[in-house]
Amino acid sequence: MYNNYIFDLYGTLIDINTDEWNDDLWKKIAILYAYKGAHYTYDELNEEYDRLVQAEKKAVLKKSPDTKVVDIKIEKVFRKLFTQKGVKVTKAEVLFIAEAFRCYSTKYIKLYDGVLDLLDTLKANGKKVYLLSNAQRSFTENELNMFDLTKYFDGICISSDEECSKPDEKYFKTLFDRYGLEKSESIMIGNDYISDIGGAADFGIDSLYIHQSISPEIDGELRSTYKVMDGDVFKIKKLIINHS
């Protein structure tokens, strides 16, 4: 019997399309930096952003060499883009840049059909619901709130907080240790056959794979216990709730 249902977020509960390589995005962000006195051309800003992201990843790996799949706190990058131009900013100003970046880069965002029904059913049946997401808190917290999803979760892990991502077993262990979960009572639900499903298999828990349009192409073994290949969230209940 499953008592703990662990969800991926993007591509599983939330359908999202973003474009972080669009010139218009970087032109707008460059204007916001210029408002505070940090002047960049848009292509310079894009290049510096990419460079600082890689530098942050190296710094995390140096600090935690046992981490196999690194994540970073993107706010550090946005702050450094100010400081290397000699501009001091507050935490709130950095957060605003992060939120603007996410907003300008998002082409659409919505819940998949059936998500609220699924979560309501889990809670009505006394199940525990957890989030294990490869994401940035400065992006994800707002998006959880906009869809009123936070109330459903008994625990939330966001990779930027831990500086570690799926499919790293270390990240799965963080969730299980923090909330005292048993592997035999837990199942991972996600749309990425490597990060979600491969990670769950390596960690030793069951999983359900749901294929969505933004899912990476499956190139190898799909190691899930269950699968929904047509993206129909409503089918999840029949597979892993009614028979749990």
Show the residue positions of the predicted features.
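Short, acidic loop-to-helix structural element flanking the phosphoryl-transfer center
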Residues: 69-76, 91, 103-130, 141
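A short acidic, glycine-rich active-site loop
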Residues: 31-35, 105, 160
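Asp-based, Mg2+/Mn2+-dependent phosphohydrolase catalytic module
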Residues: 1-5, 15-19, 36, 40-43, ...
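Pocket-edge positions in alpha/beta enzyme catalytic cores
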Residues: 18, 66, 70, 103, ...
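Basic, amphipathic juxtamembrane/active-site segments
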Residues: 20-33
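A metal-dependent, Asp-based hydrolase signature
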Residues: 30, 43-99
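Short, acidic, Ser/Thr-enriched surface-loop or helix-capping motifs
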Residues: 8
